[in-house]
């Protein structure tokens, strides 16, 4: 199923976190009264969430969204996740699909030292 599909970017982040020997929860679930949100990585020791955002988080994709309305919902969800994490005192580090893997690694090393 799609829920068990991880992008190359997410796999790379996982490998870097493992390399840095950082404990994390993958696909961490945050629940509100209305719905559930899955966060790509939650690092409890750091009070940090990491989201690897693919292209579909930034622009409409027929493949991912099917309709413009679904793209708008995607953007709303991203905003709700930011607000929810902020309210819980969890920092959010967003990695864009446009970021080179080399830079992803450097950024994570800085963030987690």
Task: Give residue ranges: language-model regions.
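Nucleic-acid endo/exonuclease domains
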Residues: 1-113
């Amino acid at each position: 199923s799609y829920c068990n599909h991880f992008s190359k970017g997410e796999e790379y982040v996982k490998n870097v976190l493992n390399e840095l020997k950082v404990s994390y929860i993958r696909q961490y679930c945050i629940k509100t009264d209305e719905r559930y949100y899955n966060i790509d990585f939650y690092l409890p020791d750091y009070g940090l969430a990491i989201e690897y955002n693919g292209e579909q988080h930034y622009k409409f994709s027929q493949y991912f969204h099917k309709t413009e309305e679904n793209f708008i919902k995607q953007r709303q969800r991203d905003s709700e996740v930011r607000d929810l994490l902020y309210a819980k005192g969890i920092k959010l580090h967003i990695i864009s699909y446009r970021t080179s893997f080399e830079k992803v690694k450097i950024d994570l090393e800085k963030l987690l030292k």
